[in-house]
Amino acid sequence: HTLTGINGSSQQRFEQFDLNVAVTRLNLFGISADNANLHIARLRNDWEATISSADINGKIAIPDDLENGTVTLNFDRLKIISNQSGEDNSRIDPGKIPRLHMVIDDFSTNDLNLGKMIVKTTKIKNGISIDTIRFMKPDLQISGAGHWRKEDGIDDSQFNLDLRANDLAAMLETFGYSKAAIEEGETSMNLAARWFGTPMDFSLGNVNGTLNLDIKKGQFLNLQPTAGRLFGLLSLQTLPRRLALDFSDLFDKGFSFDQINGNFTLEDGNAYTNNLFMRGPSADIIVSGRTGIQSHDYDQIVTITPQVSRSLPVASDLFGPVGV
């Protein structure tokens, strides 16, 4: 069965309306669910739909005047599987999407759980403006804004996103990199990106824009012993760790760093940088060149500057003056 006609004239025809139905397949405002229980009721000047299934649990309030009103979604949980309906995202016209206000306590897309989600949109010419988009977990926060337009049949999406994570390893695990050889690392990122496609078509391999990165105090894991570790052992910057008998950054965990930062230009499936900088207790490392996001290849120059000047005073104390 198909329910239609929820518009301005429906108020006169449905002063009282209450319907419970079990559906094998539900698609409502782009949200799909299998084997869902749907309750539709008339409340004052709104329609209220309550949805319950394995992947969705919550309520949608739909105003009579979709052109000027706001559709409100309050969900306990929502899990979206890409292309689960087999529909082509390019067939969606963002200019026909009503104003939205969404609050979802537990949001997942595919196997990616992003915690609580808040989205607020307004209508613009040929599309929608995403005025607010936020994802919140205890160790990860993402916030930003953007827009989605369709002109002459071509989708155009543009977003600016800020990401904050208390632990880089936990963030990478959230995004599916559970075997990332890194630990700790307070992370800040800013992504300004544009791509031809819908917001659901986003991937780093198909966007143009910029990515700014800053990571503080982390460790690369499972590195083999190298001469660089000796400088790390002797570095003045890590002397407080040594006095506390803390050698975990050298032996137990791998190679530690104090800061990593850099700026990338994203273009045609590649990321370009001339200032990716890592400062560690044993060396400064600068990387410039290209990373192939889609082709998984590299064309880079890596410059390593050992922290000899910072390490020699400690070395002198331990091994005697130079030349002795």
Regions found by a protein language model. Name each.
Residues 43-45:
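A short, compositionally biased
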Residues 16-29, 39, 48-57, 63-113, ...:
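Small-residue helix/turn framework positions
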Residues 2-14, 89-94:
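N-terminal leader/targeting segments and the immediate start of mature chains
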